Amino acid sequence: MNENRIMRKGAVREMNRYWLHAASGELSLARDNGKNIEKESEPQIILLNMEEFQQLEGNYPHRKNLISSMRFIRYSKVEAFHECVQGIIHVPKQGSKKEKEFSFGFYLFENKLFLIEEDEELQEILAKVKNDMFDGCTLHMVLLFICNALIDNDILYLQKIEENLEKVEDVVIKRIPEHFNEVIMRYRKQLSESRAYYEQLMNMGDFMQMYMNRESLVEEEQGWERYMNRVERLHNYVETIREYLQQIREMYQTQIDIHQNRIMSILTIVTTLFLPLTLITGWYGMNFPGMPEFQWKYGYLAVIGVSVLFF
């Protein structure tokens, strides 16, 4: 079975295979029209889905480990074995209804980088990172470029959240907004997902940096160090926004307390004003037979007059 052709539900499906030309650093889509134009020794980037990855012929060490990890993807991670480097990346949804979360796995073995996904998002990302490649670019660097491309627009997403929270703050200052808790909980959930995502990416970057150091790949090590620093800045920005969110919640609670204090002040004034009347009502509500006012024909009018004077 050719790696380029995988039988699936009775049809022949072409995998997307790219050749990375080491000398020029160019990335080109392989064209196989019955002729093996490219050299098999050239580094290859192969996009395929899970079923195709499972059906690949040949010896791919620890492939079952990656397949097992990809069945239930909940977080991003990377693992290095003696023969290969593999991992999964879970990219959370970022706010907009048009955006969606997606996940993919990667498997780096010899001169091949397999990118396994079901959502067909990586082809666009590869087209984007083609311009970043340079002479002598390696598959390790290609993987780094992909990871960098995944967070290119994250700062804009976080800035949008901060701007929206500023609008919420302006409303809270003027009045007590409706559905405040629902809005805050939505932003809190988004920020929690982003924080966990960046923590996982920092762990991945740290791991890859140590791996490159062990393999004496100096340029790749420096690249992963820069990536980790970039992710760390995004993580710190998320923490700053989370603190800002907490300040807005405290401001909202302060407004609630002020509003409740105003109500209690009004109730206290009303209670104080009507206290004498309440006292009179309590006295005469007991209906003791020894009260002289009950025997006096002007007693009723006298009590009314006293009440009016107190009020």
Residue ranges with predicted function:
Residues V91-K93, V172, M212, Y252, ...:
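Short, well-ordered turn and helix-capping elements at secondary-structure junctions
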Residues M1-N131, Q200, M204-S216:
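Helix-boundary and N-terminal cytosolic regulatory elements
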Residues N36-I37, L139-I151, F180-R188, G223-Y227:
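Short, charged, low-complexity loops and linkers
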Residues V270, F274-F311:
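Alpha-helical transmembrane anchor segments
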Residues E99-H179:
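Switch/coupling subdomain of P-loop NTPase systems
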Residues E178-Y284:
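Membrane-associated alpha-helical segments
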